[in-house]
């Protein structure tokens, strides 16, 4: 009886641990690709990447981004 109780306890503890891992990895950090505001941890999804606050890029920033992608 004790073995069964221990096995069930370990199994339930494992399930709780997996749920915690999923909850802690639910958001993505700033600067990574996103589709919705809910994807970002504390940021907003701006033009496909997490940023806080949303930055409106100027000509120089757009040009630098163009060269970074090359």
From Swiss-Prot:
The name this protein goes by in its record: Conotoxin Lt11.2
Domain remark from Swiss-Prot or TrEMBL: The cysteine framework is XI (C-C-CC-CC-C-C).
Subcellular location: Secreted
Keyword Disulfide bond on entry: yes
Disulfide bond listed as a keyword: yes
Keywords: Amidation, Cleavage on pair of basic residues, Disulfide bond, Secreted, Signal, Toxin
Propeptide residues per the UniProt entry: 61-70
Pfam families recorded: Conotoxin_I2 (PF17557)
GO molecular function, one term: toxin activity
PROSITE patterns: I_CONOTOXIN
Residue positions where Proline amide is found in the record: 57
Cystine crosslinks: 27-41, 34-46, 40-50, 45-54
Coiled-coil regions, chain positions: none
Known tissue expression: Expressed by the venom duct.
Entry-linked InterPro entries: Conotoxin-I_CS (IPR013141), Conotoxin_I2 (IPR020242)
A GO cellular component annotation in the UniProt record: extracellular region
Signal peptide from the UniProt entry: 1-26
